[in-house]
Amino acid sequence: MPTSESRKVFLTGASSGIGLEIAKLLGGHGFDVWGTSRDPARLQQVPHVHPVSLDLAQSDSIRVNFAAALREAGAFDVLINNAGHGAFGALGSMPADVLREQFQVLVEGPAELMRLALPSMRDRGRGTIINVTSLAAQFPIPFMAPYSAAKSALSVLTQALRIELGVPSIRIVEVRPGDIHTPFHEQTRKVDGNARGADHERMKSVWETQMRNMAAAPSPACVAQAVLRAVNSRNPPPVLVVGGVFQARVAPLASRLSSVRLQEYVLRRYYQL
């Protein structure tokens, strides 16, 4: 059971990839973590983690299971919106339900959790909300338009909340990873599987580029460390870009100094389109 002294965290997507790394690191630093998964049995053996069954695609699941976790914890010092998965396919032929599902999981679900967590943070006069977005919010990934757009929406939502909240002791932070070596693509829903000809070749090029980049990318430990720093800081930066040197430092700086046309040209070359 959690002690009264330990800080309590509600973390979505805790059973794999970045979320699992965050759960392990925070648990190892004395936090008690309520970690969500659609398969909570995967978290049974992770120290200091209380498994929570939660499906971000279902509003009732969010409300009921967060409320149960809040009753158990008493209060949450930190909310980390991390869970998510992608959808890969051409936007022009992507089914509408795929677009809706991406925004439900990546935008509406996190927004609902923020609404649920904020009242107790306001009552206590303190708290931290961390939203894990993606560098795709700034540099959209071809054939992952719904994912890129949803992450961009979550980024803007985070900034808007920070501006309108006006409570300095409740910190609102965006953690924006670039490519990270995780099983993310194993969980990506591939649509347009019957694409042929030029479309098929373009999609194949982007997918293979992404797979190469992910294989050579930093481990999720760098994201977990950024989250730990943000949680422990009294005045964390509003946005933390995390990843390899080029993606985390060079690309964001270059984007501020270049035109949209040039950025799109570079992205096409990057993905060999």
Task: Describe each region flagged by the PLM.
Residues M114-R115, Q159:
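A short, exposed helix-loop element centered on a Lys and neighboring polar residues
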Residues S15-S16:
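Conserved glycine-rich cofactor-binding loop
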Residues P47-D60:
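Rossmann-fold cofactor-recognition segment
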Residues S134:
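Residue(s) in the substrate-gating loop at a strand-loop-helix junction
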Residues E164-M214:
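C-terminal beta-strand-loop-alpha-helix "lid" module of Rossmann-like NAD(P)-dependent dehydrogenases
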Residues A90-L91, V98-F103:
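Substrate-binding pocket helix/loop in short-chain dehydrogenase/reductase
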Residues M114, A150-A153:
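Active-site helix of classical SDR
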